[in-house]
């Protein structure tokens, strides 16, 4: 597992499950659009951003960008890094049919793609973080 200093913010539990198999990090899910009305979760994200910094990693579909933009406006941008996954057509194994936009989400990405996304976002990765 790869240690990550920042808190990783994802849309849902399947995204969180996928990332927790790769990264040793605090991972918080927004419950999709649920974060819009969840003042406690938003307050938690603000506190975590101040303490450790955040990396936002949402799906590359329209919903993911709406959530990402909401968080951009709600949390000090200086404390938030933006990680992006590529647009790849397909469907996740657990789903019977593709998403509305036909793109793979965070949960459908390979470990290498997710590691690269965090690295490109400037997340603090590495073994030296084990003692944080």
Stretches found by the model and what they are:
Residues 66-74:
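Short Gly/Thr/Asp-enriched flexible loops that form oxyanion-binding sites at enzyme active sites
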């Amino acid at each position: 597992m790869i240690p990550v200093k920042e808190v990783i913010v994802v849309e849902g539990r399947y995204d969180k499950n996928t990332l927790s198999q790769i990264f040793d990090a605090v991972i918080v899910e927004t419950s999709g659009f649920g974060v819009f009305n969840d003042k406690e979760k938003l307050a938690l994200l603000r506190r975590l951003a101040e303490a450790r910094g955040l990396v936002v990693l949402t799906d590359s579909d329209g919903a993911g960008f709406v959530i990402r933009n909401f968080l951009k406006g709600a949390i000090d941008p200086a404390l938030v890094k933006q990680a992006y996954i590529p647009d790849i057509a397909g469907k996740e194994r657990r789903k019977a049919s593709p998403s509305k936009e036909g793109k793979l989400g965070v949960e459908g990405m390979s470990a290498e793609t997710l590691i690269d996304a965090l690295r490109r976002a400037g997340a603090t990765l590495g073994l030296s973080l084990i003692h944080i």
